[in-house]
From Swiss-Prot:
Lineage: Bacteria, Pseudomonadati, Pseudomonadota, Gammaproteobacteria, Enterobacterales
GO process terms (BP): modified amino acid biosynthetic process
Catalytic reactions on record: L-cysteine + L-glutamate + ATP = gamma-L-glutamyl-L-cysteine + ADP + phosphate + H(+)
Record's protein name: Putative glutamate--cysteine ligase 2
Gene3D superfamilies in the cross-refs: 3.30.590.20
Organism encoding this protein: Salmonella newport (strain SL254)
Length: 372
């Protein structure tokens, strides 16, 4: 299958996708009623889109093209309002978090959608196990070569994005000992992790052509890389974050990625090389396992440094770009988070350590998303 031409988009514009949990009180397991909610809210939308994801317990909120985080926040807030209203009318709850802590994958119903049914045929039970919840951020690029450079540049900071957003310590009723267990779900997929090395858009088109030979790849959407180009939108899409518990944190993560993209494309601080990726999965694992307490290893020098310290360095580097884009509030909030030394996975564990239950945890998450 031929690859779409790269659609020219305004650099640094934003799109945000949030995969939300649809919850069934009073037991607070996952519901299978996302279709009911989607049908109820679609006529009320004035911007953005609310749609299905893989299974009937998932609901995706997606903004339109936004010039800055304020516009994105306004669209997401409006969608949040109509979803919460519809959920209340149908006696359902909505919450964030990268995993549901005690759902059973065997109970998950794959959406009655041609693409997802085809994916179920290809991947079997792996698709039901992929009932996990992430935040994706699109950043606009002027051309395909810029998109490939940006993808490689952003890949340096995949551990930082994971650690800041980690919100999936529990799965199948157990503490996984990971800050972000969600990404482990995709480890069995043949396209898990970083995109195979290419140096420009022409080489990427050749890569896509070869991948399509497998008959498992019909479009870019069938590739589950941590970061991928989206030629139809003219963007690069970062896909490694857990869905946050609050809309504010989702906006902060989007602001960081937007500012990082601006810094990378204007300063060009890296000359991408294939060797950059030799320790990619090791550093990614550190972020998933330990969050901000993880340790990064420099592939060229062997130097090791705390992920929290390197994240503060990233925030300092992108601050001038954030100011130009109107995203400095996001950088300030994330800097405070790092200095306090926590993420949402840590909060969840503290809730349980204080005597809370996993059912109570999801109840609390629904209250947080509803602003209670």
């Amino acid at each position: 299958m031929a690859l779409n031409d790269f659609h020219v988009s305004e650099p640094y514009t934003l799109g945000i996708e949030l995969e939300m949990q649809v919850i069934n009180p009073p037991g607070y397991d996952l519901s299978q009623d996302s279709s009911t909610l989607i049908d109820a809210v679609k006529p009320q939308l004035t911007a953005g889109e609310i749609k299905h994801d893989i299974t009937e317990s998932m609901l995706e909120m997606a903004t339109g093209v936004c010039r800055d985080i304020d516009q994105a926040a306004a669209q997401l807030s409006a969608m949040q309002h109509v979803i919460l209203q519809a959920a209340s009318e149908h006696h359902l709850g909505i919450c964030g978090g990268g995993t549901h802590p005690f759902q059973k994958w065997q109970r998950q119903e794959v959406c009655d959608n041609e693409r997802y049914q085809r994916t179920l045929e290809n991947f079997g039970y792996l698709i039901q196990q992929a009932t996990v919840f992430g935040q994706h951020v699109h950043v606009g690029c002027a051309n395909g070569d810029d998109a490939i450079y940006l993808l490689h540049g952003l890949s340096h900071f995949v551990p930082h994005f994971i650690a800041l957003s980690a919100a999936s310590p529990y799965m199948q009723g157990s503490d996984t000992r990971f800050a972000c267990a969600r990404l482990n779900i995709f480890s069995a997929f043949p396209d898990n992790g970083p995109m195979p090395w290419v140096s420009n858009w022409q080489e990427f088109a050749g890569l896509f052509r070869r991948l399509s030979y497998t008959t498992m790849i019909d479009s870019i959407k069938d590739l589950h890389w941590d970061i991928r180009p989206s030629p139809a939108f003219g963007t690069v899409e970062v896909r490694v974050m857990d869905t946050p518990l609050t809309l504010d944190h989702a906006i902060n993560m989007a602001g960081l990625i937007q500012a990082t993209a601006h810094w990378l494309l204007t300063e060009r601080p890296f000359k991408p090389q294939e060797q950059d990726y030799l320790l990619y999965k090791f550093n990614r694992f550190q972020a998933c396992r330990y969050g901000l307490e993880g340790v990064l290893t420099d592939v060229y020098t062997g130097d090791r440094r705390r992920l929290a310290d390197d994240t503060l360095r990233l925030l300092d580097n992108v601050t001038p770009s954030a100011r130009k884009l109107g995203a400095d509030s996001a950088i300030d909030a994330l800097r405070l988070q790092v200095k306090k030394g926590g993420n949402e996975a840590q909060y969840m564990r503290e809730f349980i350590a204080d005597g809370g239950s996993l059912i109570g945890l999801i109840q609390k998450h629904c209250e947080i998303w509803a602003g209670q």
